[in-house]
């Protein structure tokens, strides 16, 4: 399965800054009925722990344009509580994905926009995003414009 351009466009425009990799995993499971092939323990550029999910030829973090660095086995000890917390969240999500989506307003909104926005509108938003990023305009401004 390839990375979905419509989903990435929405994540980077209308939902910029609202989603994390757990949300992306839940959305992929709900919309495409596709489970991750691998779970990667990582940290972001600020050193915050985050789980990334690997699919056939992309990662959940790519939908958010996040650069995550995988952590080593020794580093897992320092992030043990975060790992346990996020793995518990993953289990809750996987247990009943539709209930999780229903009880998470931003994911419910995302799915509604994903299903109801036309391909033309999403393509137009994607073009705006490319132009704005090329000109150095920040994501918050782009989010408000879409």
Curated annotation (Swiss-Prot):
Membrane topology type: Single-pass membrane protein
Cellular location(s): Host membrane; Host cytoplasm
TM helices/strands, residue ranges: 10-31
Any one cellular-component term (Gene Ontology): host cell cytoplasm
Pfam families in UniProt: Pox_H7
Keywords assigned: Host cytoplasm, Host membrane, Membrane, Transmembrane, Transmembrane helix
Keyword check for Transmembrane helix: yes
Gene induction: Expressed in the late phase of the viral replicative cycle.
Protein purpose: Contributes to the formation of crescents and immature virions (IV). Interacts with phosphatidylinositol-3-phosphate (PI3P) and phosphatidylinositol-4-phosphate (PI4P) lipids in order to form virion membranes. Mechanistically, mediates proper formation of OPG125-hexamers, and hence the honey comb lattice and spherical immature virus.
Family: Belongs to the orthopoxvirus OPG112 family.
Protein name: Late protein OPG112
Organism of this sequence: Monkeypox virus
